[in-house]
From Swiss-Prot:
Xref: InterPro entries: Wnt, Wnt1, Wnt_C
Protein name (record): Protein Wnt-1
Entry GO CC: extracellular space
Function (record text): Ligand for members of the frizzled family of seven transmembrane receptors. Acts in the canonical Wnt signaling pathway by promoting beta-catenin-dependent transcriptional activation. Plays an essential role in the development of the embryonic brain and central nervous system (CNS). Has a role in osteoblast function, bone development and bone homeostasis.
A GO MF label: frizzled binding
Gene: WNT-1
Pfam families: wnt
Length: 126
């Protein structure tokens, strides 16, 4: 017959791009927090510890906000303690706004440009 008596529902994950954009948005809005202490009343033991923004001018984080306790190491400079090599001496792309771009990779230190002329043989036909 042409009737349908069973319906199946399922949940589907969003696209990888959608998830990535969502996480990047949360990451860009993340704030540093400290562990606060509301008081010593034993009745409010569940609320004894809570997260407070490090900067009092910021609003307290919601359960959906991305927060962090420790600052990230400075990846621009060498550090044997954290194992970061730094970015000094690296090659960068002066026209790129991405991670390989000089503005980001050189950490505001400035950079030297080098123009190089390369002559190569090719199988060109005119």
């Amino acid at each position: 017959s042409g009737s349908c008596t069973v319906k199946t529902c399922w949940m589907r994950l969003p696209t990888f791009r959608t998830v990535g954009d969502f996480l990047k948005d949360r990451f860009d809005g993340a704030s540093r927090v400290i562990y606060g202490n509301k008081g010593s009343n034993r009745a409010s033991r569940m609320e004894l510890h809570h997260l407070e923004p490090e900067n009092p001018a910021h609003k307290p984080p919601s359960p959906h906000d991305l927060v962090y306790f420790e600052k990230s190491p400075n990846f621009c400079t060498y550090s044997g303690k954290t194992g970061t090599a730094g970015t000094a001496g690296r090659f960068c792309n002066s026209t790129s706004p991405a991670l390989d771009g000089c503005e980001l990779l050189c950490c505001g230190r400035g950079y030297r440009t080098r123009t190089q002329r390369v002559t190569e043989r090719c199988n060109c036909t005119f």
